[in-house]
Amino acid sequence: LDGGTNWKWMTVKGFEKTDFRDIEAFDKTTAVIMGIAEPAYILRTIDGGDTWQLVFENKTKGMFLDAMEFWNEQAGIVIGDPINGHFFIARTFDGGQSWQGIPENLSPVADSGEACFASSGTNIRKLTKKEAVFITGGLVSHVQVRNKKIRLPLIDGKETTGANSIAVKNKKTWMVVGGDFNTKDSSTKNAVISFDGGKTFVLPDVPPTGYRSCVEFLKKKQWITCGLNGVDITNDDGKTFSNISKEGFHVLRKAKKGKTVYFAGGGGRIGKMVW
C-alpha cells in the first residue's frame, strides 16, 4: 500500500497448499487470485486480503489454469491448458465475482503437445477493448486471437520450450518471449516481435541473454524482460537487448500508475526498478 516499501506476507486460510500463480489487484482492498490445478480456484478479496471468497472452482481432471487478464475493473478472462483438445477459457463481467466457462466447441483448438505456461501470468493480454491475444508453447508454439492461429518462430519441439509471455504495445505491435526453461542460458529463438498484428514476426539481432518467462512494454520503443538468469531491456523495439541484471526473476509487471516495475522470483524475492 506504500509503493513497495513494506510488504505483508500472508497465506489464504483453507488454501495453504494451493499454488497461486496470478493476481489482479484493482485497488488497495480488491483483488482476485488464481490457483492453478486440480482443483483450480479463483478467490476474491474486498478487504485487502484479510478474507477471501471462493468465486470459481473446477475439479475437472487435467484442469490447469495459466493466466488471467482484465480489460477493466469488470471484464476479465482466464485461460487454461487444453481439455479434450480445446483450451479452457472462462470470462467474468462483474470484476471476478462470478466466472462463466466458454463452451468447449467455441474454444480454440490445441495441437498435440501444445499448452500454455503458468510462469508469469502474462501469456494472455488484452489486445483491443474487446479482444485478447494469447500464446502457447510445448511441442509447438503459436499466438492466437480467437480461432486465428499463427505459428511463432520460437524454439519449440519439447515440453519445456516455446512462448512464455506476450506484451502488447498496440494492436499492431506485440513482443513474445520464451525459450527452453531447462537451458536457462540459451538465447536461441527466445524472443520475437511483430509490427503488423501477428502477420509476421522478427527475431532480434541481439536477443535476451537466456530463457525469458515475462516481458512488459514500458514506453516508446522500450521493453523489459526477465527470466531465470537475469533481466534484459531493449530501447529499439526488440532489435537489440542489453542485460541489466544477473538476478533471476519469474515475473515483472509495470505499475498501473507511475514509473515503477516490480519483479518477483523464487525464494520470496521481490525487486523494484524505477524507469
Question: Language-model features: where?
Answer:
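Residue-level hotspots at or immediately adjacent to binding/recognition sites across diverse folds
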Residues: 1-275
